[in-house]
Amino acid sequence: MIHKLTSEERKTQLESLHHWTAVPGRDAIQRSLRFADFNEAFGFMTRVAIKAQEMNHHPEWFNVYNRVDVTLSTHDANGLTERDIKLAHFIDEVGKHAKAA
């Protein structure tokens, strides 16, 4: 069973995620990324989609042209879990050439 992060776990885990912010009114984190163009943004989304499918953990996201907004929360746990942190680190790695939007 997946458990939500405790407040101490959340504090420790989120310290390493510099571009992520808490979502107001939800136990979730979000990040916006800006790429050179739509093709680069879509390529990023494809890489994340493949990883998300492998993890069986899917992000909420929104894309317009070169911008991708990502929200992470684990629905089964009704909040942030280790899965969200792992996927956020993967997103940071594959999106490292993007600008914070």
UniProtKB/Swiss-Prot annotation:
Entry keyword set: Lyase
Enzyme class: lyase
UniProt EC number: 4.2.1.96
Source domain of life: Bacteria
InterPro entries noted in UniProt: PCD_sf, Pterin_deHydtase
Catalytic activity: (4aS,6R)-4a-hydroxy-L-erythro-5,6,7,8-tetrahydrobiopterin = (6R)-L-erythro-6,7-dihydrobiopterin + H2O
Gene Ontology BP, a term: tetrahydrobiopterin biosynthetic process
GO molecular function, one term: 4-alpha-hydroxytetrahydrobiopterin dehydratase activity
HAMAP family listed in its UniProt record: Pterin_4_alpha (MF_00434)
Assigned protein family: Belongs to the pterin-4-alpha-carbinolamine dehydratase family.
Name of the protein in question: Putative pterin-4-alpha-carbinolamine dehydratase
Organism of derivation: Burkholderia mallei (strain ATCC 23344)
